Amino acid sequence: MADKITSRQEDYSQWYIDLVRSAKLADYSDVRGCMVIRPNGYAIWEKMQAALDGMFKQTGHVNAYFPMFIPESFIAKEAEHIEGFAPECAVVTHGGGEELAEKLYVRPTSETIIWSSYKKWIQSYRDLPILINQWANVVRWEMRTRLFLRTTEFLWQEGHTAHATPEEAQEEVIRMINIYRTFAEEYMAMPVIVGKKSESEKFAGADATYCIEAMMQDGKALQAGTSHNLGQNFAKAFDCQFQTKDGVLDYVWATSWGVSTRLIGALIMAHSDDKGLVLPPKLASRQVVIIPILKGNKDEVRARARFIAKTLNRHGIPTFVDDSENNSPGWKFAEYELQGIPVRIELGPRDLEQGKCIVARRDTFEKTELLLDDELTINIEEILNNIQQNLYDRALQFRLDNTVEATTWEEFKASVEKGFVIAHWDGTHETEALIKEETKATIRVIPTDEEYRQQYNMDEPGTCIRSGKPAAQKVVFAKAY
């Protein structure tokens, strides 16, 4: 019930944990650092999977599956890559009661094991491009965990593509980060900033990393998706060469890209409130709950509720009826608000007599009377569309209200405690590290979206916010999850 949830104002971190557990999205496991994704949480992941998988396939990608165990010799082939992941790796040393001749790493990501296969599959330009996605679990040994946001094992998708030219690879990188943006904004109703990571924040082993960054309700940033241009690094590590159209040998150009169950954490923190989960309808496996008020002629009310549910379901609006008599209508209202059901329909004997029902929105708690006629389905559909748009608009306005353009170091330090800060940066790793050390803020994204760049005059030369040296552009700083 919602009364178990700490308010956001009182303790945002505890609010998040309370909500995840009370809404039955996930729970802690007896395995340290791991979580159990409960049916309510997994239903959201299934909706995310279905939407993303469709978008991947529309752009020519296919699914495959590769082993979760990676030989140590494979990992060692890409030095920068393993250096980035070494502290997070889980290693298998024994199997079948014996010590293994070669250690096996439980995949923290799959570049190395996949490129060992690509080397066998690619001989000529005719074998390219390869556009493969994998839905899998990965393991990264986390010391400080938080449900959905940071766990030792998590679910994700990882795309791995191979190309004949650097131009094709770069096109793929941009295509995929734009797919993530579309998914975040159109399905999650979560506005994101698209751009590049700084050199120190990019993926280990990549030439460049592109990302989408979202603002949570506490003003912190959350990296919601990444797309990496791997250049020829992995192809060289695995000696993956192909014969070009000109008949010469060249190394393959590569990309990788992925999102994870971390998106569920982002979804929660972008929209939810002190009463519980708030879900955009497109990611709600159950969009409408009908609660009959069982007084007087119960059978007639029940029958009408089930008829309405059947009609809505037939029109593609997932609807269910809670006509149990174990709990009061008030208890049910609070419970389904906690679970984030976007629309609630209340139907009692008096409503039936008057040919109407009460419809309540989860996002605004606004109640409307609707006639029980042929227009009911259309009206419910319109309300669901309005909720989807309102959640996006609300989140975008929140980001606008909590984004500051800082021109002094004092202003920067004060503002970064509350949200995003746009400021000049001199482009050096030293200044970036100093800012992180003093404020815990990092460069979240160097925006590439032209509209965003113009909105904040990102290309305007100026003075670095920390070093005072000349700076060619502004970047987005924030504290992050």
Swiss-Prot record:
InterPro entries named among the record's database cross-references: aa-tRNA-synt_IIb, aa-tRNA-synth_II, aa-tRNA-synth_II/BPL/LPL, Anticodon-bd, Anticodon-bd_dom_sf, Pro-tRNA-ligase_IIa, Pro-tRNA-ligase_IIa_arc-type, Pro-tRNA_ligase_II_C
Root EC class: ligase
GO BP annotation list: prolyl-tRNA aminoacylation
Keyword Amino-acid biosynthesis tagged: no
Source taxon at top rank: Bacteria
EC number, as in UniProt: 6.1.1.15
Alphabetical list of PROSITE patterns matching this protein: AA_TRNA_LIGASE_II
Keywords for the protein's UniProt record, in alphabetical order: Aminoacyl-tRNA synthetase, ATP-binding, Cytoplasm, Ligase, Nucleotide-binding, Protein biosynthesis
GO terms for MF: ATP binding; proline-tRNA ligase activity
Chemical reaction(s) catalysed: tRNA(Pro) + L-proline + ATP = L-prolyl-tRNA(Pro) + AMP + diphosphate
Entry's Gene Ontology cellular component terms: aminoacyl-tRNA synthetase multienzyme complex; cytoplasm
Localization terms from the record: Cytoplasm
HAMAP family: Pro_tRNA_synth_type3 (MF_01571)
UniProt free text on domains: Consists of three domains: the N-terminal catalytic domain, the anticodon-binding domain and the C-terminal extension.
Assembly behavior: Homodimer.
Protein family (similarity comment): Belongs to the class-II aminoacyl-tRNA synthetase family. ProS type 3 subfamily.
Function: Catalyzes the attachment of proline to tRNA(Pro) in a two-step reaction: proline is first activated by ATP to form Pro-AMP and then transferred to the acceptor end of tRNA(Pro).
Name recorded for this polypeptide: Proline--tRNA ligase
Gene assigned in the entry: proS
